[in-house]
Amino acid sequence: MAVERVSTGIPGMDEVLNGGIPERNAVLLTGGPGTGKTIFSQQFIWAGLEEGEPGVFVTLEEHPVQVRKNVEGFGWNFREYEEEGLLAVVDAFTGGIGRASEYEKYVVKDPTDASELIGVIRQAVNDVEAKRVAIDSVTPLYIDKPSVARRIMFRLKRMLAGLGCTSILVNQIAAHERGFGGPGVEHAVDGIIRLDLDEVEGRLWRSLIVWKMRGTAHSMRRHPFEITDEGIRVDPEKVFVKERGEVREVED
């Protein structure tokens, strides 16, 4: 039976994933600072909206007003889809302090309370009948209590998959950290995409690699990508060699 897939909406990324993300998968998008994790997650939501798939974007590390302003730089108008009832932005950043309590429909008062967060996300998903969810990021949920990281990720995955959503869960790691952030989180998700920003001989290179993706074959190579005025663009026909700072054609 053919695997039902969800397009990432990121040029070149679906080719890396052999056609897209398997439906209902929870994907950990991990990487260091400045690697493009937030843009990737927002582009995933935007692509769905453009294809008629409602979505939910959860922000834990940036004011929702700033989120809307930032995406406009790529030509993505979140406000329009919010007004149409196709997009919900969940504010898990302000804690309802200030004017956010007046203007934001979905507010998490205590972002460190996983149960409250899950409850608000569930409500938002049901209200807009979301097919896609992006959480930026899950790191604050367990940064002070790493022992519960895996359990929290399981709860999020179970809830989102149960509601029929395909999700991107942004996760932070240190610039040169080899792990995925939080003990055991890699076992609690269906897929892992790692973004990297490496300095080689005085130049910064962006690249990504799919560490795992349940339900589908995928490229096992590290591919270069760039951030343009229209978002992220991946080159599935090229492979990046970190040690040498070289980009080569993919060989069969």
Curated annotation (Swiss-Prot):
GO molecular function: ATP binding
Nucleotide-binding found in the keyword field: yes
Domain KaiC: 4-248
Keyword Membrane: no
One Pfam family cited in the UniProt record for this chain: ATPase
Keywords annotated in UniProt: ATP-binding, Nucleotide-binding
InterPro entries: KaiC-like_dom, KaiC_dom, P-loop_NTPase, UPF0273_KaiC-like
Binding residue positions for ATP: 31-38
UniProt record similarity statement: Belongs to the UPF0273 family.
PANTHER family in the cross-refs: UPF0273 PROTEIN TM_0370
Descriptive protein name: UPF0273 protein MK0039
Native source species: Methanopyrus kandleri (strain AV19 / DSM 6324 / JCM 9639 / NBRC 100938)
